[in-house]
Amino acid sequence: MQPYPTQLITLPQAIEILLRFPQKLGWLFRGQEDSSWELLPKAGRKPFYRHARPVDEQRPASRRNPPPDLGRFNHWRELAAGYSSTLPASDFDCLAYAQHYGLPTRLLDWTANALAALFFACEGHFDVAGAVYAYFPRRYIDRDTCDLYSFSGNACLRVPPFDRRILAQHAAFVLFGDPAQALSPSQFEDELKEMNCGEMDLIKCVIPAPAKLIIHRQLEDVGMTRRTLFPDLDGLSRDFVTEALYLEAFNARDKNP
C-alpha cells in the first residue's frame, strides 16, 4: 500500500487521503480549526464543565439523580416545553435538539461528509494548523436498551432530521458518558503507513496553517460553502461574513509572505 502524508495541503490530496475512510462503511468526520483542541463536547469544556459527585452505589446516576450537565439539560427541557410544542420525546433526541439550540451538552458533532469536516477545519484561525478527524464508531445508541443518565463510554447517535442543517451536513453525534474524557486519536508522525481502516478507530490529519486558505478557496470553488451547510438566512449571512474574513486573512498573508 502506498504511504500517505499525514498533512493535508491541497483539496485533491485531502480527498485522496479521506477516501481511505469510506462513509458508506460507517466512518464519520470532524473538522476543528485548531489542531491542538481536544475532542471534547461543550459540556466537558470550561466554563461549562462541573465535576460530578463521587459515585454513590446506593444512588446511581438516573433521571432523578443526574450528573451536573444532565441536570442542566433536565432544567432546560422543563423550560423549553413552554417555548416549543415539538420537543422530541426521546431523551437522546431531545439532547440533540437542545444542542442544536445552543445548550452545552455531552454530544459532539460529527458528519458523514468528509468535505464538510474539511470546510470546518479551514474556516477560521488561519494562523494555526487545523485538523480533520476520521472516526469509526464501534458502538451505536440503542434507544430500547440505553439509558442516557447511566450511559458510560462513547457511542454514535443518529437523530431524525429535525432541521435542514442535519440533512445538509450529514450530521451525526457522538455521546460521551464522561463529557470531560476526550477521545484520543492515533498519532502518525511522518506517514500513514500500512493503513488498515478496519483496525483504527480514530485518525487525525493535520492541515498546516498556510494550507487552510488554499483549501478553503478550493472548497468554495466546488460548492462547499456556509450556504450549502447552513441552508437558511443565518447561513447566508454567515457566508458573507466568512468571505470577508477570508479576504482579510488572504491579503494579510500576501503582505507578510
Each predicted region: which residue ranges?
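Catalytic-core elements of nucleic-acid end-processing and repair enzymes
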Residues: 1-257
